[in-house]
Amino acid sequence: MEDEAVLDRGASFLKHVCDEEEVEGHHTIYIGVHVPKSYRRRRRHKRKTGHKEKREKERISENYSDKSDVENADESSSSILKPLISPAAERIRFILGEEDDSPAPPQLFTELDELLAVDGQEMEWKETARWIKFEEKVEQGGERWSKPHVATLSLHSLFELRTCMEKGSIMLDREATSLPQLVEMIVDHQIETGLLKPDLKDKVTYTLLRKHRHQTKKSNLRSLADIGKTVSSASRMFTSPDNGSPAMTHRNLTSSSLNDISDKPEKDQLKNKFMKKLPRDAEASNVLVGEVDFLDTPFIAFVRLQQAVMLGALTEVPVPTRFLFILLGPKGKAKSYHEIGRAIATLMSDEVFHDIAYKAKDRHDLIAGIDEFLDEVIVLPPGEWDPAIRIEPPKSLPSSDKRKNMYSGGENVQMNGDTPHDGGHGGGGHADCEELQRTGRFCGGLIKDLKRKAPFFASDFYDALNIQSLSAILFIYLATVTNAITFGGLLGDATDNMQGVLESFLGTAVSGAIFCLFAGQPLTILSSTGPVLVFERLLFNFSKDHNFDYLEFRLWIGLWSAFLCLILVATDASFLVQYFTRFTEEGFSSLISFIFIYDAFKKMIKLADYYPINSDFKVGYNTFFSCACVPPDPVNISIANDTTPAPQELSAVSSTDMHQNATFDWAFLSKKECLRYGGKLVGNNCNFVPDVTLMSFILFLGTYTSSMALKKFKTSRYFPTTARKLISDFAIILSILIFCVIDALVGVDTPKLIVPSEFKPTSPNRGWFVPPFGGNPWWVYLAAAIPALLVTILIFMDQQITAVIVNRKEHKLKKGAGYHLDLFWVAILMVVCSFMALPWYVAATVISIAHIDSLKMETETSAPGEQPKFLGVREQRVTGTLVFILTGLSVFMAPILKFIPMPVLYGVFLYMGVASLNGVQFMDRLKLLLMPLKHQPDFIYLRHVPLRRVHLFTFLQVLCLALLWILKSTVAAIIFPVMILALVAVRKGMDYLFSQHDLSFLDDVIPEKDKKKKEDEKKKKKKKGSLDSDNDDSDCPYSEKVPSIKIPMDIMEQQPFLSESKPSDREKSSTFLERHTSC
């Protein structure tokens, strides 16, 4: 028996296969613990009052048997041991699985105070560490906090903590209003249960009520190295001549100790800036550990108050205390006490144990929580990891939900490798989206959208009351103005100024403002699009060739298209959006993003062509370059200095006078004046402006780089959190202002933003209203239905694909979508724009994504070291409405807007195009083509889909994108919407090329991080399902005698606290606590 290995009866059912993500985020425990090679069974000692406990032991022993292990489909190894459900898991499942209507337990702030000496005389409780999510220690020297780091615990300290919970006082849901009352309650309980001698009451009370010195106070704190030099001054004080009698002891206790305790927070607590890291409803958990020389056995107590109470200066921050853990022990074990204190503090910061601590009914519940924590512990070999190395907090924390779901019940969802993991919808889709369910009633979807959005209408206005909304308004306004000017200019060229820049401004303002006020998804931004521009050009040329009235013909096309869109609304046709999977969405959004990037560089190249760089220019040959202004007609030019007008007189000189004045010096005119008066520029240096192009590219690339850098400034290490967040929110506006100032200081005449200054139609041949009859034959009104069908497809596809992208699950929108309501208002606005001869507007993908990115919300308070959590998007109607109102008022702001260089706005275009590609799986898969296998990220689809299949899917997507780009660049661009619709057919065809299993990972609308979370939950549920099936054959209830963690727990078997029996060999190697409990 001495050579036999210890049998771990709990290992088989807790077999855990760690994936890379779990290992990466859970390296939190180090230590190797000596486990005895021999096993000697404990002798069962009889107790006079332990009949019930004895019967329980015997029943458990009888029911404790080996069972066969249930193998998973993906596990090749088998175990000879039969699984037994973990008693800790069973009890935790009962605790966390209870239905409780009470709110979730609040966030805990845990503080570790240790009993240290001041100048070798007085003892004080000094703060040495604190926790919210991660551990922060007082650095050596005691003048600053360490950086937050993952708490690394010794496994031995966890065993000792478990023993503390077994043998110490557990007081749950007690009531106290002050620290002295609470201390007295604890000490009396220890005396009543025989754990403390009555003559030690005053000494323990005196010790527990000593001052608390926090790190915020500017005092002479010692380093952590002095923790081991704790003091036995309490004993000296009690044995001094002044404290010889109990009466004198009591008087000293009152005067020296209780006067140091206040029920109200101190000024240092109220001024502590660390409160910003805590939510408003946070509570405190205080851990007090120390060594004294008047105790022979450890004094251990764990207290949970019925209601959290402010206990004066006990805690660093002014938050009420809910939990109190006390450990006072004999001298010589300061290091062990310190590690036990860190262990309980770390457990209190663990989300699962945190919930158990709040819901525990007795001691066994708490012990089960510790066992569950030990089940999840990762042990690092002591020779392969230095515990002094502080582990940086991970960027993304592993979700505790998968641990909680294992115990809280729920469906046992199993994933079949031959079927899609999302439920069998062939690659995701939106079948589970309530907004896209077909009602089968006339306008049923529209009515449901109205009912869904009506309750939020008021909140859509007051939810915008945040400084973040201002930055979004300015950013999107400048993007919208630039877009309106660009498309307005192109539209004017395509339609002979029948629609121009001013019409673009007015149409954008009217359509956008009405849409944002009444549509189902006000975060969507309307704008003109490339396909609409192509259609307008073709329609104008067609009307011109056949002598049709262009505006009237366009009016009837718009009316027919609006009518068809309303039919689609009435028949709930938006349910077809559920067939737009990731393949279609990413193809469309990536194409639009690439168009933005391409157009930004195209405009800069065009600018460089207009202001060329003269590469032949040489500094030493300045005389070779010249440029002169000559009159348009050959006249006898004689230089007469006395007749040459002064510069200030040029404005009074007319073109006719200049032609008639033969003695006028044309060479005196500037370039603009020469061209204005009909002159000609002659010379090889007339178009040479060397600085404009270079300066424009500096502004262009500088704006883009600055926008990207300032947007990421939120995660930098500089400045306080509030300042970083403010800079990040206003990143685009700051970049624009910075480079506008640089442009003004340098003084180079770069091209500026030109806004119409008069409110009138661009063409004098049109008005603000288009009559519907009289310009074309009657049959044209009916024939307009044919091109209107194409426009309807264009509008429907652009609008709904953008709406799907805006309403993605990862945006965490809470007020719901409104696909039918959005399309309804697009149709109504099309009628208005058709009658006013304004451009048609539809949802703009890139600007809408930029709008959402500028309104993303994160947690206001996050624990030190913890990344802010994304909460969702600030859903409201104010930002979009004000953006379009300002766009309409831009005509009156022309004197201000003219100072903005166009290269700066092109840089904003480039930023929007690149930023909208972030988080797109298509781009991630493109990068995989350039990565060696060992450097590829841990994407969920790479775990389940062969790499060659991933590359094949990416190749097909690139091919479709290339075809769409080629189509867009030709005259056939008018059928661009039809080709977008063809992407759906291409995706359906992939069902014959890829298995549903592969498509479910490659073409799923579920975000990557949520998909990992789902998979981990399914693994846990599958594991829980096997445990449930085993539990049907076992009626073994929970007992602390049964091992419940992955490693042998025989050394932790409970023994009578005041046992008088002779300890066995195993007991001799037990913890320090067991060595002091035989008094």
Curated annotation (Swiss-Prot):
It catalyses: 2 hydrogencarbonate(out) + Na(+)(out) = 2 hydrogencarbonate(in) + Na(+)(in); 3 hydrogencarbonate(out) + Na(+)(out) = 3 hydrogencarbonate(in) + Na(+)(in). Residues 39-78, 237-265, 1012-1079 are annotated as: Disordered. The keyword Protease does not apply. GO terms for cellular component: basolateral plasma membrane; plasma membrane. Residues 39-52 have a biased composition (Basic residues). Phosphorylation of Ser-1026 by PKA increases the binding of CA2 and changes the Na(+):HCO3(-) stoichiometry of the transporter from 3:1 to 2:1. Phosphorylated in presence of STK39 and dephosphorylated in presence of PP1 phosphatase; phosphorylation seems to inhibit SLC4A4 activity. The chain crosses the membrane at residues 467-491, 502-520, 522-542, 551-571, 586-609, 693-710, 726-745, 780-807, 820-836, 838-855, 878-894, 902-918. It is found in: Basolateral cell membrane; Cell membrane. GO terms for molecular function: monoatomic anion transmembrane transporter activity; sodium:bicarbonate symporter activity; solute:inorganic anion antiporter activity. Residues 1-466, 521, 572-585, 711-725, 808-819, 856-877, 919-960, 987-1079 are cytoplasmic. The modification Phosphothreonine is found at residues 49, 249, 254. Residues 1057-1059 are annotated as: Required for basolateral targeting. Residues 492-501, 543-550, 610-692, 746-779, 837, 895-901 are extracellular. Residues 1-62 are annotated as: Required for interaction with AHCYL1. Residues 961-986 dip into the membrane without crossing it. Residues 53-70, 1062-1079 have a biased composition (Basic and acidic residues). Pfam families: Band_3_cyto, HCO3_cotransp. One of its GO terms (biological process) is regulation of intracellular pH. Expressed in colonic mucosa, kidney cortex and to gastric mucosa. Belongs to the anion exchanger (TC 2.A.31) family. This is Electrogenic sodium bicarbonate cotransporter 1. It comes from Oryctolagus cuniculus (Rabbit).
